[in-house]
Amino acid sequence: MKKGFTLTQTGILLTLWLTFLLSFVMRLSWSSLMPIVNEALHFTAQQGTSYLTAFYFGYALTVLPGGLLADRFGYRKSILGSLVAMAIVTGLMSTVQSYEYGLVLRFLLGIVSGPVQSACLKAIGEHFSAEQRGTAVGIFMSCTSFGVTVVNGYAPFVAVHYGWQMAFLITALLPLLVFFLALFTVKEVQAFRKGQTEETQGTGQQSMSLAQSLRFVGTNRNILLLAVMGFFATGTTWGVTTWANLYLVKQLHVTPIFAGAIMSIYGIAAVIAKPTIGFISDRISLPRNYLAAIVMFLFSPALLIFANTSNPDMLYITAPLLGMGAFMYSPLTNAIIIQAAPPELRGTTAGFVNLFNQIGALTAPIILSTVLTATGNYQTALMALSISPIIGAILLSLIRLK
């Protein structure tokens, strides 16, 4: 099959990319603004970190139900509903005056963001053939790291010059713009069904009950390995990403704007790396899980180098290296999710794996905060996570794909 994208495919991929991008801009807005808001509202570092944890609690509650809903009622409804809800909750963050109120809002933001990734991956599975998915998912997943670049590119600047409330209000407007685009471009189309025939063989049926769906994803060896891998790898990625601004400001004593600029470079490196590795994976014979294991293993030394950077000028080198290490594996692992799942269970499978991803992302800030409390050192806290990508790489090497 021709590997180039049609105009329709390009349109749907752009919309999915923007939707997932904004889900990360909403998520990361707090990480970018945390040093400023903590000071303005007199929050402790642990209170600020608990806002990250609250988001992941809410997110983890809805990733699996979101996948089930996308399989049964369609990804279009999931995407449109999430965009509107994310805009409302993020706008309300501008009204936070108490710790408890903000904590509830962050929890709600996690709940309404949870269904997005599963719905988008299901849409990619329908609209792109097996030979196109590495590139498509690579482009799609670039939005997560680009979200780091986007939010750090404007949020600290707006907060410093116009107030942190205005930064949240501007952030809240963005999903509404994409909502109107999605109304016209996101369609439920069962594409490339003939080319997917070999992927459906062995499932035994076209439609599964809720119990059968959960039983399948909970007992499939490849899916379970992907899930546990995600706990270690994704947890480390987002633990590092959400804590990096605080580390730079508190440990290296740089300004919030400088930290935002460094994290923008971090994100740009990941943006370039993701579609590049996806493009490569579509054109080499090495199985995707082995390629993913290699790039995930490299995440560990990249994190150690970043955590041991003492000269702020060296961050221009070590931050992009970390950005590539932290994100390059994700297009490959998400393409493997689509490949490992029957077409009718792609949303459920993505939600199941993402549930473990978010448990990891929920656990990582707790580990970081605990180590920080015990040692008083942000550097040691980051280094404590460096073993996790190695464990993830080992698990990826055990996957067996047809």
Residue ranges and their predicted role:
Residues F140-A191:
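Helix-loop-helix hairpin linking two adjacent transmembrane segments in secondary transporters
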Residues M1-T6, Q190-L226:
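Juxtamembrane intracellular "pre-TM" segments in multi-pass secondary transporters
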Residues V63-G74, K274-L286, L372:
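Helix-to-loop junctions at the C-terminal end of transmembrane segments
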Residues L61-E100:
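Conserved MFS/SLC helix-loop-helix module at the cytosolic interface between two early adjacent transmembrane helices
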Residues W30-S31, R221-G267, K274:
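Extracytoplasmic gate region of multi-pass secondary transporters
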Residues L105-F146:
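Cytoplasmic helix-loop-helix junction between adjacent transmembrane helices
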Residues K77-G91, N289-L304:
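Structural signature of the two symmetry-related core transmembrane helices
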Residues G11-A45, V240-N245, A364:
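Extracytoplasmic
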